[in-house]
Amino acid sequence: SKEGMSYEEPENDEGVACTGQYAESFCLNGGTCRYIQSIGEYYCICVGDYTGHRCEKKQV
């Protein structure tokens, strides 16, 4: 339910772009850092064959 929310922006599971040191160094191997405000978690959108929470693993 949307009651009590003061902003119009829809909830988005992709989160928002990370800032500061997280944007710089949280994701490895070219991954894009995202922050999910509702749960206070950072995660990475990986590129190529990389996987893992911080794109630290390469799939074979």
From Swiss-Prot:
Domain EGF-like intervals? 14-56
Arranged from A to Z, the UniProt key words for this protein are: Disulfide bond, EGF-like domain, Nematocyst, Secreted, Signal
Compartment(s): Secreted; Nematocyst
Q: Which cysteines are joined by disulfide bonds?
A: C18-C33, C27-C44, C46-C55
Query: A single GO CC term, please?
Result: nematocyst
Q: Which family does it belong to?
A: Belongs to the EGF domain peptide family.
Can you name this protein? U-actitoxin-Avd12b
Q: Give the lineage.
A: Eukaryota, Metazoa, Cnidaria, Anthozoa, Hexacorallia
